[in-house]
Amino acid sequence: MSPLECGLYVVATPIGNLGDMTLRGIEVLMLADRIACEDTRVTRKLLSRYTIKTKVTSYHDHNANTVRPVLIQEIKNGGTVALVCDAGMPSISDPGYKLIRDSIVAGLYVTVVPGASAGLSGLVLSGLPTDRFLFLGYLSSKSQQRRNTLEEISGISASLIFHENPERLVRSLKDMSFILGDRQAAVLRELTKLHEEVCRGSLNELWAHYAHSAKPKGEIVVVVGPAKDVEKISDKEISTI
């Protein structure tokens, strides 16, 4: 294996099945001077699977402002840092983008080692149109903010991809059904894992299904089909939901 050029390596990791790690990703993690990750416990399971001994540093929302300058300085000093998240592509719904941004501003070498993505995997498996799509991450836990976001995107003619928390799934599906209309959608849970589950149907059907089922567990992706002739509802109607 050839030595790495000093810089920041943004490395995708498996979203569930550890066997999905790419060969290049394994090589970069082995050769890097340091791995910056969200949860060291999660990342060490992956490293153990592939006998990787590289130093690990925790980098997450609560310490990012302190750790980020240290990582950038290490690269400036000639080091190589691999950035990973708990699952999937770093900087998607995590603080990774700020490290990438600041590294670029500092004139450092930045490259990506692609791989698994829960959002894209969910879109493909949903069976919904893939030619145009919009990824929105997690909707707000606050009801009104969540509805406002859904209102803003209600007329977009593209498949919509969300990450969702099991605690909020039913409420989010209810809001989607009322505001986006009864579009076709899919709820994808525990992708690539032993208990992978895909439920497809209209938003109304999915809302009813999960409202009368035990609370789901694990990581969830919701994909909603494109808008067609979406009937708008008034603010008064929304407030009664």
Explain the meaning of each model-derived region.
Residues R68-S117:
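Glycine/small-residue-rich loop that forms an oxyanion/phosphate-binding "nest" at active or ligand-binding sites
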Residues E5, T80, S159-I241:
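A contiguous loop/helix-start segment that scaffolds small-molecule binding in enzyme catalytic cores
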Residues M1-D61:
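Glycine-rich, flexible N-terminal cofactor/catalytic loop recognition
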Residues K98-I156:
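Class I SAM-dependent methyltransferase SAM-binding "motif I" and its flanking Rossmann-like core
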Residues T57-N65, Y138-S143:
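Conserved helicase motor
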Residues R41-T43, G88-M89, A118, R168, ...:
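Alpha-helix capping/helix-boundary segments
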Residues L29-I35, G107-T111, A158-L160:
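Short active-site oxyanion
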